[in-house]
């Protein structure tokens, strides 16, 4: 139902675009540190172990986030998780930009990794759920869009490095890595605004949780589908 009709297809395209926006941010934050690790090592006088700690913190955070993400999604819903994980990106990006030492930077990158680990599986689930079963924009092509989105994010980070390098005065070239990491808060705030405006909870998730009344309400409000749940279905215990 959610993928048929003009209203359903319009909403599905918006959800797919928003999910790809999250993947774009995941890729940007995962790759952004690569451009400034030498400057960070020099500024904080890092040992090889310290450099490894800073560089790997986001990966360890992503592992923990991926493990927590599935549990949280089952408990509170995809939409709530999808909105909350963006807060990790905003807070962590600002903390990275202002980090006074390697420990704060590593901690902020770990928190950012939590956001990546939570966001990516949920984004892929939305891509799969809201894609067509066949024809243009089918599941295979929609899910595969994560790949060019990922490459685009890395390309944008390269362009940002060139831009900031060109505009920063030479006396403040040490700000470059801070600006690149801190810039991640900008798309995160944009994504939060768009998600809050155009997204709702997944009706499929609500139905799978046994909450048929909520699923029907989402279909009516977000997809203009006149869905109602028979009274006898409401009286049956959830599976």
Predicted regions and their residues:
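Transmembrane-helix signature of 12-pass secondary carriers
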Residues: 1-239
């Amino acid at each position: 139902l959610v993928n048929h009709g003009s209203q359903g297809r319009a909403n599905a395209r918006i959800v797919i675009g928003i999910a790809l926006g999250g993947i774009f941010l995941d890729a940007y934050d995962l790759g952004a540190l690569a451009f400034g690790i030498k400057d960070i090592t020099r500024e904080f006088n890092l040992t090889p172990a310290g450099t490894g700690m800073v560089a790997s913190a986001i990966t360890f955070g992503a592992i923990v986030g991926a493990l927590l993400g599935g549990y949280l999604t089952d408990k509170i819903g995809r939409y709530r998780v999808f909105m909350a994980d963006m807060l990790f990106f905003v807070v962590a990006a600002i903390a990275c930009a202002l980090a006074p030492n390697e420990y704060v930077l590593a901690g902020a990158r770990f928190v950012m990794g939590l956001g990546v680990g939570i966001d990516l599986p949920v984004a892929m689930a939305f891509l799969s759920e809201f894609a067509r079963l066949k024809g243009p924009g089918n599941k295979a092509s929609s899910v595969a869009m994560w790949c060019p989105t990922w490459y685009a994010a890395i390309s944008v980070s390269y362009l940002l490095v060139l831009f900031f390098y060109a505009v920063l005065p030479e006396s403040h070239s040490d700000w470059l890595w801070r600006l690149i990491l801190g810039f991640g808060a900008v798309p995160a705030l944009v994504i939060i605004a768009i998600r809050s405006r155009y997204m709702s909870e997944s009706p499929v998730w609500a139905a799978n949780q046994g909450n048929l009344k909520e699923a029907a309400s989402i279909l009516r409000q977000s997809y203009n589908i006149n869905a109602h749940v028979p009274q006898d279905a409401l009286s049956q215990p959830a599976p």
